[in-house]
């Protein structure tokens, strides 16, 4: 980011949380959990940690919305909700009907917050709903 700021006057930096979508990278949070659970491989989980997850299609929709406005040099695009790691694991277990095998680790880290440019007005315009079903719907969409 500093490289871009120093060298380009006209720029936009877009930051995202963990994205849910089709990705060949096995080390993304969602692929890691899905691959370990579906193959019954044991893993460690900070079950009390919270993560911000966003469907990649919603990320694109929000990105284009902000880029059209042309008034931001830096944009933080995120879900308004944070999900406990245990909830993410449980939703994947429910989808594939395989119990996760994991060691519970205590969270040594402070859960982080993102200064989010996304607000309810924008979500209403774009018809994006971060409701109770958002996480499970997004997981089903890409991992079913």
How should these model regions be labeled?
Residues 2-51, 56:
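NAD(P)-dependent short-chain dehydrogenase/reductase
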Residues 26-31, 60-61, 90-92, 117-118:
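Short, glycine/charged-enriched secondary-structure capping and boundary segments
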Residues 20-23, 44-50, 75-83, 105-112, ...:
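Glycine-rich Rossmann NAD(P)(H)-binding loop
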Residues 7-10, 97-100, 126:
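A short helix-to-beta-strand connector/capping loop
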Residues 65, 94, 141-144:
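Residues within well-ordered alpha-helical secondary structure of globular protein domains
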Residues 56, 84-90, 103-143:
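Conserved C-terminal active-site "lid" loop/helix of NAD(P)H-dependent oxidoreductases
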Residues 62, 69-109:
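Mid/C-terminal beta-alpha module of Rossmann-like enzyme folds, strongest
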Residues 1-4, 60-63, 89:
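Short-chain dehydrogenase/reductase
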């Amino acid at each position: 980011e500093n490289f871009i700021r120093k060298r380009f006057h006209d720029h936009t930096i877009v930051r995202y949380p963990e994205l849910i979508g089709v990705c060949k990278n096995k080390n993304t949070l969602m692929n890691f959990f899905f691959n370990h659970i579906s193959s019954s491989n044991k893993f460690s989980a900070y079950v009390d940690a919270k993560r911000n997850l966003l469907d990649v299609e919603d990320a694109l929709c929000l990105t284009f919305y902000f880029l059209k406005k042309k008034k931001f040099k830096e944009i933080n695009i995120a879900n308004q909700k944070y999900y406990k790691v245990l909830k993410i694991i449980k939703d994947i277990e429910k989808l594939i009907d395989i119990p996760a095998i994991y060691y519970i680790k205590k969270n040594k880290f402070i859960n982080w917050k993102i200064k989010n440019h996304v607000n309810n007005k924008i979500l209403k315009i774009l018809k994006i709903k971060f409701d109770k079903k958002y996480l499970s719907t997004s997981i089903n969409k890409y991992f079913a």
